[in-house]
Amino acid sequence: MNLNSNIAEFCTTNFKYMIALSVNINKIATIRNARGGNTPDVIVAAQNIERFGADGITVHPRPDERHIRYADVPALKKVVKTEFNVEGYPTSDFMELVIQSKPNQVTLVPDAPDAITSNAGWDVETHFDFLSGIVKELKSHGMRVSIFMEANPALMAKAAATGTDRVELYTESYAVGYSFDKEKAVAPFIETAKAAHSAGLGVNAGHDLNMANLKYFAQQVPHLDEVSIGHALISDALYFGLENTVQMYKNELM
C-alpha cells in the first residue's frame, strides 16, 4: 500500500462526511408579513444565520407571497455568501425569478398554489417529460437542480434520467414514525439514499426534521449531502436564541 492509499484510508476511517445545514427562513418572513414593514429583516436574518454557522439559506416563494416575497429572492442572492437554495413549483413566474436570480440550487417541489407546506414528492414517472424539460432549462443557466421526492428506491434511476443533480427526500413519514419505531421509519430512506447514490445523484433531505430526530437520521442515512430545516429551527430559536439554535442543529449533524 502506497502513501496516498494510507492517507485515503486514514481519512475515510477518521473523518466523518460533513452534512450541510441549509436554514429555511420562510417563517421569519411570515412574522415580518404579519405586521407589514420590514421587521424582522429577512436579509439581516440570513446574514446572521450564515455568520452563526449555517451552510446555506433556503427560501420557498409561493404565488401568494404569504411569507417569502418574490422581491426577497434577488435581494438575498446579493448577500448570501454560502449556498442559496430556492424551492418551488416551476410556474413561468418562478422560472423567470430563478433564472434572473441564479441561486446555487433550485429545488423543484410539486406544490399546489394554496398548499400550507410541501406535502408530497414528485411522481417522476407521470411528470418525467415535464421535469426533464425544466431541469434542462435550469441547468443551462448554471444552476444545480434538486427534485423533491418521497422515499422510494425504485424511482431513483428514473429521477436521475431527468438530468437532475440531486433529490431531496421528503422526510415527513420519518418524522411521524420516529417516536414509534425509528428503525422502521428510517429504513426506506437508507435504501433510497443508496439507490440515489448508485444512480449518480446527490441526496438532500427535509421536512419536519428537528432536534429530536435529526441526529439519528444523519447517522443512519448514507450519502447525505444537505438537510433543509426551517419551522422547527426557527421555533427553537424563540427559546434558545438564533445563534445557539443554529449551532445546536449543526452539532446534531456532526
Feature map (PLM): residue ranges:
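Glycine-enriched alpha-helix->loop->beta-strand junction motifs that scaffold or abut catalytic
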Residues: 53-55, 79-81, 100-106, 140, ...
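Catalytic cores of alpha/beta
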Residues: 92-101, 152-162, 209-224
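Glycine-rich phosphate-binding active-site loops on the catalytic face of alpha/beta enzymes
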Residues: 108-115, 166-178, 223-242
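Conserved N-terminal beta1-alpha1 strand-loop-helix module at the mouth
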Residues: 12-93, 97-103, 184
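Histidine/lysine/aspartate-rich catalytic loop segments that bind and position anionic ligands
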Residues: 144-196
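C-terminal helical cap(s) of enzyme catalytic domains, especially alpha/beta-barrels
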Residues: 77, 120, 181-182, 236-254
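Alpha-helix-loop-beta-strand connector modules within alpha/beta enzyme cores
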Residues: 66-92, 126-146, 182-205, 249-253
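Hydrophobic faces of well-ordered beta-strands that scaffold small-molecule active sites
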Residues: 19-25, 57-59, 84-86, 106-108, ...
